[in-house]
């Protein structure tokens, strides 16, 4: 036997496979203020103990692999490994558990949502020992929060830029989402803005198609904004979607928007990717642009209650990556959103400090310190009859976005915008007078419609429209 072979043998390295729980299940571990904490909903395969399943998640999302390797001896696994420190059964579910995992902060690159997700969810979701796995929540430590810029501007700066206070902001997605020429698209924008909306919006899949190239759309929308501002005396905006096939093209579009002098651009942050989104957010802060975020593709990731990533995690990630608005569901419209859970992640978007509250799906106390907040956007199947509920549920710091609920008005876009603005102002006035919008909302709308024919027509059109289906999500 050669001396080199003898040296390897004397190290004491023992090859083979051993249970993850021997190394990565540590119920006595006391979490540190600097740890990133994760709550996973774990559904083990039959015969796999929950401790082994939780430990496998901790291992495969940090330092572990399927077998012992000799290079483990070249570093301090105890310093760098993830730890499953607690497991609790899910009430009412068979063989399903919440596994809590702590990750040392040194595992993550500063200021990179991309790296954080690559580590925590990048590989473990295909693990054979698990039937299903869902990331329910993350606790981001202050030490890591401070490595991110976050939203380009935040709620208060946006209000100051727009000179709009004391009420939710009103928006509208231009429909049909695809097929309009740039000039007709700009005309629709102008009609909505002059009628009383604060914003109009590109739909998420409006990029630069043959029927409407991005530069033409940007120019005609800018013309519409300036014309509506001159007529109304209010600051207006249109979410110009800068999402593109490459980061370079995305930045070219954002730069052109800045040159036009418009106040806001837009990005599809999940399909575009976190690296692109963070790059755009930094540019927007440096150049005075607001950034509207659409969550296209989120339901592919978050809708199944046993597998994937809950939207509250995607919302936290967006606040870190950067965005001034993000779509958050409506509770009352056509897209899914259970009230308490939706308001849980709305608070995670807006507030500085959010206490743990399992009844709202918040597994960890989250301190955002000085990071600006994000305005939640309620959009999808809403109309004037929903205005009291939306005002009561979301409060002033929100954007209420009516696409079909504006453009579907029987008299046209501008009257549709008037109807929404009148309904909103009536609801805010009633709330400020101490009226209960949850009980008196319909009466508030009826009273306002007596002096607004535009609102009366909208009330008649949508009086029978409801979207009532059971929610998929559970706490």
From Swiss-Prot:
Residues 1-2 form a propeptide. Mg(2+) binds at residues 201, 203-204. The modification N6-carboxylysine is found at residue 201. The active site is at residues 175, 294. Its cofactor is Mg(2+). The disulfide bond which can form in the large chain dimeric partners within the hexadecamer appears to be associated with oxidative stress and protein turnover. Keywords: Acetylation, Calvin cycle, Carbon dioxide fixation, Chloroplast, Disulfide bond, Lyase, Magnesium, Metal-binding, Methylation, Monooxygenase, Oxidoreductase, Photorespiration, Photosynthesis, Plastid. This is Ribulose bisphosphate carboxylase large chain. It comes from Ceratophyllum demersum.
């Amino acid at each position: 036997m050669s001396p080199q072979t003898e040296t390897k043998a004397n190290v004491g390295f023992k090859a083979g496979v051993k249970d993850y729980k021997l190394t990565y299940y540590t119920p006595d571990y006391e979490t540190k203020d600097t740890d990133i904490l994760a709550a996973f909903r774990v559904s083990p395969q039959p015969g796999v103990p929950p401790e082994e399943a939780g430990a496998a998640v901790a291992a495969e999302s940090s330092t572990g692999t399927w077998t012992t390797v000799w290079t483990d001896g070249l570093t301090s696994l105890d310093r760098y490994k993830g730890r499953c420190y607690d497991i609790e059964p899910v009430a009412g579910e068979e063989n399903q558990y919440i596994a809590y995992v702590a990750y040392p902060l040194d595992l993550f690159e500063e200021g990179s949502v991309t790296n954080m997700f690559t580590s925590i969810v990048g590989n473990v979701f295909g693990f054979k020992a698990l039937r299903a796995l869902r990331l329910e929540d993350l606790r981001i430590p202050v030490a890591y929060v401070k490595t991110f810029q976050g939203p380009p501007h935040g709620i208060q700066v946006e209000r100051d830029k727009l000179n709009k206070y004391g009420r939710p902001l009103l928006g509208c997605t231009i429909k049909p989402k695809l097929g309009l020429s740039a000039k007709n698209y700009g005309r629709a924008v102008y009609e909505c803005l002059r009628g009383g909306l604060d914003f109009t919006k590109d739909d998420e899949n409006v990029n630069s198609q043959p029927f409407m190239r991005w530069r033409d759309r940007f120019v005609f929308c800018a013309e519409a904004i300036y014309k509506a501002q001159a007529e109304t005396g209010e600051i207006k905006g249109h979410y110009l979607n800068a999402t593109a096939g490459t980061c370079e093209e995305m930045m070219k579009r954002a730069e052109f928007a800045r040159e036009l002098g418009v106040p806001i651009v837009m990005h599809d942050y999940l399909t575009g990717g976190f690296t692109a989104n963070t790059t755009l957010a930094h540019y927007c802060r440096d150049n005075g642009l607001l950034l509207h975020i659409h969550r296209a593709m989120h339901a592919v990731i978050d809708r199944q209650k046993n597998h994937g990533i809950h939207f509250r995690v995607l919302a936290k990630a967006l606040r870190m990556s950067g965005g001034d608005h993000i779509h958050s569901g409506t509770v009352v419209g056509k897209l899914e959103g259970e009230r308490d859970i939706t308001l849980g992640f709305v608070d995670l978007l807006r507030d500085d400090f959010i206490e743990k509250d399992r009844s709202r799906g918040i597994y960890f106390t989250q301190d955002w310190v000085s990071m600006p907040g994000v305005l939640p956007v309620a959009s999808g199947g809403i109309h004037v009859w929903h205005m009291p509920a939306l005002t009561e549920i979301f409060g002033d710091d929100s954007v209420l976005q009516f696409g079909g609920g504006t453009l579907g008005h029987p008299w046209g876009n501008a009257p549709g915008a008037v109807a929404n603005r009148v309904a909103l102002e009536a609801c805010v006035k009633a709330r400020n007078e101490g009226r209960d919008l949850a009980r008196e909302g319909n009466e508030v709308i009826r009273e306002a419609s007596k002096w607004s024919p535009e609102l009366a027509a909208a009330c008649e059109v949508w009086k029978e429209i409801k979207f009532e289906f059971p929610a998929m999500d559970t706490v």
